[in-house]
């Protein structure tokens, strides 16, 4: 499959910050500061701190109060936001191209000059506790956090990104300062942008904004996930439906089989209407509305599972039908036409995702941040073309082995 990839402009500032820019034709500029500081980088008593820091970055800097931070881009119709993941934190902005420098300067101010006022920290604790409770009240969200805890046990990847009410309420200003001093270092940050400006102009803008930021290197190493055995858990709820995840650890993003497993997961229950779980369980039997499989590859390990919600009386039948589909993928190789269709489908999905410039450069920036390189789109397509039916059988037997699957149930009470 022949696809021409738009080139990225890459550069490094003297202090070690890396720049990645994708030039586009439209008037919109996307900017992001992506920091290699996620929830897996928290120490044992810091659960939820990466996310809490992200919230508090907007509460005041050496140059601005909260109102001025929030109004700086709102006043020109722009967008400013942030999110925290297991492996990184992202601060991002979207503006019309005349306001590129304004957005870049604001992101630098937030990321490098936040003061974390004590009064604002106290108020934000209750905001985050409310966020935690909102997720706990949503079983379709909460079960994914419980599943992570199940398969990663006491490893940082198993911790809830939001933390717990107790951990969040324990944070002080010193905790936030220690965390950012330890992890918000220049060699752990990529500045990602997309827009009509040239790469050279973008580089000049960033250069003028970092005159006072000295190079800081980090020697911190991440803890490996270790061994895993299947674990099963269940919890009674007051909800009407039963929610369930069956799953296992899978391949990390740096492992050879990760792309083949991405293809396999797409066949099983990916974001398409013709995936096997949808056609053979939802459409054929009408047992569930929400049924999907997911695959999250972190740098060194992955997380895979099948999630569904259904009437309590249907849950065991759905589980049996899911196991039937997994068994078929372990034992029966895809035919030539089936494999060709599956490859074209996932290649199309990947190519279409590149049309969103902000998403495209963000994905490339994360690859640069975590792996030190960016794989060209053309090379990804060629690797997909080389995936064989035999390799799919191999990865299916490694991950879909019945005795290796963990499960978590949030059992409902049925209709009232």
Summary of predicted features, one role per range:
Residues 5, 27, 87-88, 240, ...:
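Short acidic/glycine-enriched loop/turn segments that link adjacent beta-strands
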Residues 1-28:
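N- or domain-start disorder-to-order transition segments that initiate the globular core
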Residues 12, 66-224, 244, 251-252, ...:
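Charge-rich, well-structured scaffold segments of protease-associated domains
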Residues 23-25, 32-34, 217-275, 409:
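His/Glu-based metal-binding/catalytic segments typifying zinc-dependent metallopeptidases
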Residues 8, 17, 189, 232, ...:
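Short, conserved active-site loop motifs that form the nucleotide-linked donor/cofactor pocket
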Residues 16, 23-73, 147, 184, ...:
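Active/ligand-binding-proximal structured segments within catalytic/core domains
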Residues 4, 174, 227-228:
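Short gly/ser/thr-rich secondary-structure transition/capping motifs
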